[in-house]
Amino acid sequence: MMRLDFQRKLLSHTERVKAVDFHPTEPWVIASHYNGQVGIWNYNTQTLVRSFDINDVPIRACAFIARKNWFVCGSDDFQVRVYNYNTGEKVTQFEAHPDYIRALVVHPTQPFLLTSSDDMTIKCFNWDMSWKCVQTFEGHSRYVMSLAINPKDTNTFASSCLDGTVKVWSFGSSVANFTLQAHDRGVNYVNYYPAGDKPYLITAGDDNLIKVWDYQTKACVRILEGHTNNVSFAFFHSKFPIIISGSEDGTVKIWHTLSYSLIKSYNFSLDRAWCIAQNKDNGLVTVGFDNGLITFSLGRDEPSVTMDSSGKVVWSNYNEVMSAMIRPAKEQSDLTDGSLISLSVKELGTTELYPAVLKHSPNGRFVSVCGNGEYIVYTALAWRNKAYGKALDFAWSADSNVYGSRTSDRSIVIHKNFKESNRLDLSYSCDKIFGGFLLGVVGSDFICFYDWDTGILVRKIDVKPKGVYWNDDGRFVILACDDDFYLLGFNAEMFYSAVESGTADEEEGVADSFEALADVSESVVNGKWVAETFIYTTTAARLNYLIGDQTYKIANVESSFYLLGYIPRDDRIYLTDRDMNVVSYSFNLAIIEYQSLVLKGDLEAAQGLLEQISETDRPRLSDFLSRLGYKEAALELSGDSVQRFELALDAQRLDIASQIAQELDDPLKWRSLGDAALNAWDFVLAQECFEKGKDYGSLVLLYTATNNHEGLKELSQLTKSTKINNTAFICSWLTNQPAECVNILTSTQRYPEANLFAATYCPDEVKNVLPEWKVDLTKNQKERIADSLGDLELKN
């Protein structure tokens, strides 16, 4: 049975929804309502972006025309209306039919709008020709309920009608290519199968049935029964092998396209289901009901793709399996970090089940396919079936001849050389299994690790990881949980010794076999080990690596990209999205080896690797050394002047910092160096730095502390000439120049302070300052205050 991962993105309680559509690039859903309104919703923020009051009659059809920034809607007043969804301006309005408009479809490449109506016709309008009706399709005998353009041949389309038929048409011909007598009652919906392997149509009718048709042979392939009222729609999902149907019985049902069995039935308590739309890029689905709309996803976000160490990429498109070989980096002259890589794709074969998970064996010779409750192991080169069986989950051991399959919640079968070698019957219910050096079995809130050969419990750990990643030699393992991940060290000798001595606990395992080494507060999307370095992508859209207990950023990436792996031949990391857009980033393994040796304290051996590391990468290593406290080594390695200056300060190499400051000639750098020199009691260097950095406040402190009377006098004159009056005043005061202090206060029109200071410290200056104060008061119309001051000169 296929497992669904239902995640609700948007739920809105609204008036009856009659039509929905996705914007191809924005996170928007448009919905038209029975009350004559149209709303655009953002399913990421769950907010209404814009609302349009179109009219007061039902609007049964709407769609985005994204390449024109428009949306179009058709209603029961026979009108088609077109609006600019950015400005809210109505672009045009015209009568398309003499009766209710039931459906409309926008052609994916041509400037065509198809409409269908209760007048039993279909019309094609060309917006480049001022919305001229360029063709009318006649032949149905009742209301035409839905339209669908063939994604594999956009010159043809299908229509469904309440006369019980489905007709397939071609643009340019007014006569239907053929007619299917699809249902005993009205046909509400028609939809094309999106993949290239099957020429199928699906129909939904008022006889409560869903039917799958081969439009080449005109034969009914399968009838799906389960709804108890009129079926409003049945829809092939573009990403997963499922059919989604909705009915006036209020349910939305999910069916498997391979077995045609019912997987799941949902009732969202929104009454009758009327309409559906799908985002072809991300697989999101929106369904409209009597009482609102809901947007949701059903499958895993990760693409079904795997890559071996040579660069061979294998992925699936439904049950078709494709492959491509990534060309060596030296053959790609335009290769840059983050740029798209051109792939030469070929069809590798098909698989008998839908591959939810594809995984290369460690040696790259085999590829496992797991899905629909089964697994198949294929040879990687010829794509021949090597083994198969039941499996809810599949996991490879570090030994490519050993693998495990979870056949039920309490049973795991281990195979060796493609034959069953052991079986674990668990005392608890398990959710998932992981491969690697040990077999990881996830319970309700813990994970148990078992030895592949003996099935003995190695250790029970009280965390529930969503991902388990072993390095190649089995000494380290990452447990990736929802919000953080843990680095553990594994001591195999400790485990085997405990087993031999009989001290292994049957319920907890060997406590000392694992050691916690690091706890990192980041959410891992997926990851790979390269030697002793863990490379991973995060939910924050970053590509990072962990070495020791320190994390470092490689690049920011799109959130939709997933890690494929590292190719040593290219020294590059490769990532892909669901549409197999592959990008890469440089990752020099010599850098990692250098960092690993430094973490072990072997700086001498690390120095021997520097020849393999480019000058552009060395500043990053310099940062790494600095963070570990190796300031001198970081200084020697760095070639960036700004970085070297900071490192020289940290290493207290003031001579080197002084040379760099001379080169940079930045006042801020001089001031920083001056502070460092002051802390080192190097007053000569400090004075030079503060002078060149024009740090006059620090110079006052330095001259005062060293009793440099002449320095203060010179500083007083310098700051006075540059109008730094506070410093000039302090320097004049400290050098016992009260008259100069009065002069500074007067020049800045601080007359009250000047008179008070003069009267206190140099009375002879009052006769010069007081008249200026009085003149200033009079100028500001304060004659009474000026007259009341009296003759302070006489009093003194």
From Swiss-Prot:
GO terms for cellular component: COPI vesicle coat; cytosol; Golgi membrane; nucleus. GO terms for biological process: endoplasmic reticulum to Golgi vesicle-mediated transport; intra-Golgi vesicle-mediated transport; intracellular protein transport; late endosome to vacuole transport via multivesicular body sorting pathway; retrograde vesicle-mediated transport, Golgi to endoplasmic reticulum. It is a peripheral membrane protein. Keywords: Cytoplasm, Cytoplasmic vesicle, ER-Golgi transport, Golgi apparatus, Membrane, Protein transport, Repeat, Transport, WD repeat. InterPro entries: Beta-prop_COPA/B_2nd (IPR006692), Coatomer_complex_subunit (IPR050844), COPB2 (IPR016453), G-protein_beta_WD-40_rep (IPR020472), TPR_COPA_B (IPR056176), WD40/YVTN_repeat-like_dom_sf (IPR015943), WD40_repeat_dom_sf (IPR036322), WD40_rpt (IPR001680). Its main location: cytoplasm. PANTHER family: COATOMER (PTHR19876), COATOMER SUBUNIT BETA (PTHR19876:SF2). Pfam families: B-prop_COPA_B_2nd, TPR_COPA_B, WD40. WD repeats lie at residues 4-42, 46-84, 88-126, 131-170, 172-214, 218-256. It comes from Schizosaccharomyces pombe (strain 972 / ATCC 24843). It comes from the Eukaryota. Gene3D superfamilies: 1.25.40.470, YVTN repeat-like/Quinoprotein amine dehydrogenase. Belongs to the WD repeat COPB2 family. Oligomeric complex that consists of at least the alpha, beta, beta', gamma, delta, epsilon and zeta subunits. SMART domains: WD40. One of its GO terms (molecular function) is structural molecule activity. The coatomer is a cytosolic protein complex that binds to dilysine motifs and reversibly associates with Golgi non-clathrin-coated vesicles, which further mediate biosynthetic protein transport from the ER, via the Golgi up to the trans Golgi network. Coatomer complex is required for budding from Golgi membranes, and is essential for the retrograde Golgi-to-ER transport of dilysine-tagged proteins. This is Probable coatomer subunit beta'. It is found in: Cytoplasm; Golgi apparatus membrane; Cytoplasmic vesicle, COPI-coated vesicle membrane.
